[in-house]
Amino acid sequence: MIVLGIESSCDETGVGVVDLDEQGNLTILADAVASSMQDHARFGGVVPEIASRAHLESMVPVMREALHRAGIDKPDAVAATVGPGLAGALLVGASAAKAYAAAWDVPFYAVNHLGGHVAVANLDGEPLPHSVALLVSGGHTQLLEVEAVGLPMKELGSTLDDAAGEAYDKVSRLLGLGYPGGPVIDKLARRGDPQAIAFPRGLMKKSDSRHDFSFSGLKTAVARYVEAAERAGEVISVEDVCASFQEAVCDVLTFKAVRACQDVGAKVLLLGGGVAANSRLRELAQERCDAAGIELRVPSFKLCTDNGVMIAALAAQRIHEGAGGSALTVGTDPSLAVETPQVF
């Protein structure tokens, strides 16, 4: 069965196509993505109106590219992200998916963006044991308890202020490195000393929430360090600042993720979201999972960021479990809860 997925929750227009066999195994047939990231760069972050307009311009070309790569005229089912995400951006993708589903006379599946990140980390088709998912991006930093792909997830904790990816972007702007901050900070951090500056780790005291995150204090600490150096006329090592900041972020993320696994008895940690492409996060997560006897599953770098494959993968899993399609009247929900894998 051929399933096509459309992703448009933020600044990427993604169309992915997967082939679902009778055993539930998935084969990726196409992964086409158009990003409007450069359109947002001069604003230092994603502008919702610009993102929506970019989706409108990119949807048809990206769809054509995906169908061409997959070598098909039409799929057997169409899925789309209906939340969470930017309201206007979600509307573009969901509306397109409904139109294509109606024109092709195939079922439509309205699915959860966050569930897609979990599904794409388990593309091998093997049954997913009781797991914890750490989803880290510019808009989300969450720990989720996962019983199986396509089933409702339970939120164990989330950020109380800035998402991890958002903190990267803000620190990058502070250092004059531009937007987005994740890739450039990761690159510079490799040349710096992660122990050079003792930046704080938020919510790491015994009295703090075990599974929640906070990165606003870290962001402020970086700003104060830079301001103090400028007042003193000192030249800072941008590489050391990046390395020390990144170490603080990854230390907290991986420590709490492994602890969450231990707290709920999960033997697998799933890592997803754009920040999951970060080299230090992947490295430290692997080290700590190995030490704790936990299996780490991480998607390829390309599938960490938003894409249509993850939406197709989640819908395919729902189809394999016998779920019917969603109504074409289903609306989008920018604040869709993780407990809702599919909207009917």
UniProtKB/Swiss-Prot annotation:
GO terms for cellular component: cytoplasm. Substrate binds at L135, V136, S137, G138, G139, D169, G182, D186, N278. Its cofactor is Fe(2+). InterPro entries: ATPase_NBD, Gcp-like_dom, KAE1/TsaD, Peptidase_M22_CS, TsaD. PROSITE patterns: GLYCOPROTEASE. It is found in: Cytoplasm. Binds 1 Fe(2+) ion per subunit. It catalyses: L-threonylcarbamoyladenylate + adenosine(37) in tRNA = N(6)-L-threonylcarbamoyladenosine(37) in tRNA + AMP + H(+). Fe cation binds at H113, H117, D306. Its main location: cytoplasm. Keywords: Acyltransferase, Cytoplasm, Iron, Metal-binding, Transferase, tRNA processing. It comes from the Bacteria. GO terms for molecular function: iron ion binding; N(6)-L-threonylcarbamoyladenine synthase activity. Its EC number is 2.3.1.234. GO terms for biological process: tRNA threonylcarbamoyladenosine modification. The keyword Transferase applies. It holds the Pfam family TsaD. Required for the formation of a threonylcarbamoyl group on adenosine at position 37 (t(6)A37) in tRNAs that read codons beginning with adenine. Is involved in the transfer of the threonylcarbamoyl moiety of threonylcarbamoyl-AMP (TC-AMP) to the N6 group of A37, together with TsaE and TsaB. TsaD likely plays a direct catalytic role in this reaction. HAMAP family: TsaD (MF_01445). Belongs to the KAE1 / TsaD family. This is tRNA N6-adenosine threonylcarbamoyltransferase. The gene is tsaD.
